[in-house]
Regions:
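Generic hydrophobic alpha-helical segments
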Residues: 16-24, 127, 161, 165
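Active-site and donor-binding regions of nucleotide-sugar-utilizing enzymes
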Residues: 2-102
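Short, glycine/serine-rich, charged loops/turns that create anion-binding
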Residues: 39, 62, 112, 147-148, ...
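Short beta-strands and strand-loop turn motifs
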Residues: 1-3, 55-60, 109, 141-146, ...
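Conserved catalytic-core segment of nucleotide-activated headgroup transferases in glycan assembly
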Residues: 129-178, 182-189
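General structural feature for long, well-ordered alpha-helical segments within catalytic domains
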Residues: 16, 73, 87, 91, ...
Length: 190
């Protein structure tokens, strides 16, 4: 299925609900944990809550600015979940404003920070060699994620990006571009 079509998220969510429901029916968990605001997680959360499985949601109450579906998906996930683990006090307040019980909301910080701290990364010499850099201080890592509800503006965004890159070519900076996420419009960016 074309992941850049406007119906792709809906189709992915519907398939995800079915697949996760089948898996949950087989393993019968006492608790299901889901993370953040992605449509794949939304599908899993719908399946778990509709099956009566206690569901914990991490990163509810956060805000993403800039025309994505993230906030509406995240807030929907929050309303469906039973337990809430937030990244900050503002997120906790938002969840409480949505009517969730204070006894089910816990401010725990951002779990991925712990993973980053526990991970081993390449040292400076490895990075310089791997990417052909003169040194690590002269790089820009660039990622452009699509904004699904503004898919028609991607070419206009690229004009601005292209102009910025032209100006950066005059410097001694090296630009490393990464792939976008899989949201609608990602293929066009690639």
């Amino acid at each position: 299925h074309d992941s850049d079509s406007l119906d792709s998220n809906s189709i992915t969510i519907s398939k995800g609900i079915s697949l996760v429901a089948n898996a949950l029916a087989e393993i019968k968990p006492d608790l299901f944990i889901v993370y953040a605001d992605r449509y794949e997680g939304f599908a899993a959360l719908i399946a778990s809550t509709q099956m009566g499985i206690v569901t914990a949601h991490f990163e509810g109450g956060d805000i993403t600015e800039g025309g994505t579906f993230d906030d509406s998906v995240r807030h929907s996930m929050t309303k469906l979940a039973h337990l809430h683990f937030t990244t900050n006090e503002d997120a906790t307040k938002r969840i409480l404003q949505l009517g969730e019980s204070q006894e089910n909301v816990f401010t725990v910080g951002l779990p991925s920070v712990d993973l980053i701290k526990a991970s081993e990364f390449s040292d400076e010499d490895e990075l310089v060699k791997k990417y052909g850099l003169k040194n690590i201080n002269n790089i820009i890592v660039f990622t452009q994620h699509p904004i699904p509800i503004e898919k028609d503006n991607i070419s206009k965004e690229f004009e601005s990006i292209e102009n910025a890159f032209k100006n950066l070519r005059l410097t001694n900076l090296k630009i490393i571009c990464t792939f976008p996420n899989s949201d609608i419009g990602g293929k066009e960016i690639i």
